[in-house]
A protein has these predicted regions:
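A structural signal for short, well-ordered beta-strand segments and their strand-loop junctions
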Residues: 25-31, 130
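Substrate-binding cleft of secreted/luminal carbohydrate-active enzymes
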Residues: 53-164
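Extracellular/luminal regions of secreted and cell-surface proteins that mediate adhesion/ECM remodeling
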Residues: 148-304
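Solvent-exposed loop/turn segments at secondary-structure junctions
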Residues: 33-36, 135-136
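A structural motif corresponding to the C-terminal end of an alpha-helix
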Residues: 13-27, 123-124
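Short catalytic/ligand-binding loop motif for oxyanion handling, primarily in non-cytosolic enzymes
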Residues: 35-39, 188-189
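Non-catalytic protein-protein interaction scaffold segments in large eukaryotic complex-forming proteins
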Residues: 20, 29-34, 41-44, 48
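Single conserved hydrophobic/aromatic residue that forms the stacking wall/gate
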Residues: 1-5, 9-12
Length: 304
């Protein structure tokens, strides 16, 4: 948002930005007050976003935040009017919306050290940081040894903590899988994301996919989420061993099969760069010899 504009003109600019973007995509504004005033002018509540109204096409769910002078003065160069209340507001909004920015030359405060910066980024749910500005502060964090950790934990960072599964399954019968994923990052995804369980034949690479009714945007920071899957194997699925993968692709059809847009789990040794799959380090045996439960539901793997 351009500085020096009155509230009515800011509203007009923001109207056009939201109109130009696809539904569900988000813009960012310089201060919490910009968003709150825009909502007030539109007759909307100015309280922080909650799970009840997040991820909708409502205007409150489509306006995130950008701090131009992070930890650079008592008010971050005018980012905050009421520092305590505004930070509380941003911490709540950052659970559902993009929050990030850049540093500035400190004015009236000491440069933020690593511990303070990391604590503040986690509290405010930061998803990105400008690496080019301000070098004086960024280089300080590099010298103090925390920049690599900041990069790892910025935004979401999903770690598979445990899992269990049916090891032997008959075609047409029930496969059970339970996964637990912890988000060790500062924030959560703010754009939609698909989730798929993938079975791939060890011998000939034939692949079967099961879309899951799971929303990774709800895997919030410092929380562990459980995914429980009960699905059927196709009745004509060939006998053999199959490795299990978790795929978190972009849901847009033009990007869904592009591994560059798939989410990579933080666990070592699980990422498959050529497909964008995350190996669960699990293998099932599809066999005609096992007496397992017949599956009569609607969730069935399909051949890719």
């Amino acid at each position: 948002m351009s500085r020096g504009l009155g509230d009515v003109y800011k509203r007009q600019v923001l109207d056009k930005l939201l109109e130009a973007l696809p539904e569900g995509r988000v813009v960012q504004v310089r201060t919490p007050q910009y968003k709150q005033e825009y909502l007030r002018l539109n007759g909307k509540p100015t309280t922080a976003l909650t799970a009840a109204n997040a991820y909708t096409n409502g205007i409150a769910a489509r306006i995130g935040h950008h701090n131009d002078c992070f930890m650079a003065s008592e008010t971050d160069y005018g980012t905050y009017q009421n520092v305590t209340e505004d930070k509380k507001y941003l911490g709540q909004e950052g659970l559902y919306l993009p929050m990030g920015g850049e540093t500035c030359p400190p004015d009236g405060v000491s440069p933020a050290d690593c511990s303070k910066a990391q604590e503040e980024m986690r509290n405010l749910r930061w998803s990105y940081l400008n690496s080019d500005y301000y070098k004086g502060v960024n280089d300080r964090w590099i010298a103090q040894g925390c920049m690599d950790k900041i990069k790892r934990e910025m935004g979401y960072r999903f770690v598979l903590t445990s899992g269990g599964y049916t090891t032997n399954v008959t075609p047409g019968h029930l496969l059970k899988v339970v996964l637990r994923v912890k988000n060790e990052g500062y924030a959560a995804p703010f754009n939609p994301r698909a989730v798929e369980l993938v079975l791939r034949n060890v011998s000939d690479q034939t692949t079967y996919v099961l879309p899951l009714d799971v929303d990774p945007r709800k895997w919030k920071p410092d929380m562990e989420s459980t995914i429980e899957i009960e699905a059927g194997l196709p009745t004509d699925m060939p006998i053999g061993d199959y490795d299990i993968y978790l795929n978190l692709p972009d849901p847009m059809e033009t990007l869904r099969d592009n591994p560059d847009y798939s989410i990579q789990l933080a666990n070592e040794g699980v990422w498959e760069a050529e497909t964008g799959y995350n190996s669960l380090l699990m293998r099932i045996n599809v066999t005609s010899d096992e007496k397992t439960d017949i599956y009569n539901g609607v969730l069935v793997f399909t051949k890719k």
